[in-house]
């Protein structure tokens, strides 16, 4: 079994309040969840209105599938013009590592 996690550090564009931040982040999180059927949540910078960290995780029997899904999530987030992807921190674990 393979487990992949990824933290995507994101700078939000023209956002001036936490309410505006939610209107950008929630649809993005929902789109990731819908397209890839994986666990996803806002996991960092929750109190800053122009930054967020989105965390995703995927489990599969195949390491290549885990890598493909996390790469696709990164491309999806990077393709949104209202956000700028600052950094991506993927991690891969085998059940034998745990």
Model-derived segments and spans:
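Short, well-ordered turn and helix-capping elements at secondary-structure junctions
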Residues: 12, 42-44, 92
